Amino acid sequence: MSEPAPPLESALLVPVPEAEPCVQKHRFRHDSVALLGVPAHITVLYPFMTPDEISDSATAAVERVLEHFPEFPFLLTRLEHFPEGATYLAPEPAAPFVDLTMAIAERFPEYPPYGGAHADVIPHLTVAQTPDAPADELAEIERHLPIRCVAREAWLMVEDDKGRWHTRTRFALARSARA
């Protein structure tokens, strides 16, 4: 008897289209989710509900939380490395992303950030999942820094039964005179 397939996943994220020209080819080589349809992004909450658990009321609850957050500018200023080996671009300021994550996690306490694996929320845009990204590729990314960005929306993305990711719902952040 074969083992059952792992449950499908979902995630809430802030897409960062301004970073795509700089990081896309590197993410395609070193971040497996990039080839599965996940754009350059900063995670708000992962893992979230399985796709079949996402109801209209859950989507409305996410929208009610996010509607209180204004869009905001940020910079991707430097490459950093997690101890586990992933390389990422750090956003400045990081606080608005932490605030988004904490507000969603407070509303959905059964889905802690990163499944509760980490004590702190460290906003990041992953460029490589493994520590073996070549130094010349990282230097190429660094030449484009800082990257000016604006967080305008959050996306609820879901995985399908083939492992590909699709945007299910887009949530606009409130318009802001600052952004």
What do the predicted segments below correspond to?
Residues 1-73, 81, 94-153, 167-179:
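Basic, often amphipathic N-terminal segments
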Residues 80-84, 159:
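Flexible glycine/acidic-rich beta-alpha junction loops that bind and position SAM and/or redox cofactors
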Residues 91, 159, 173:
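Active-site donor-binding loop signature of nucleotide-sugar glycosyltransferases
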Residues 152-162:
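Short beta-strand segments and strand-loop junctions that repeat across beta-rich extracellular domains
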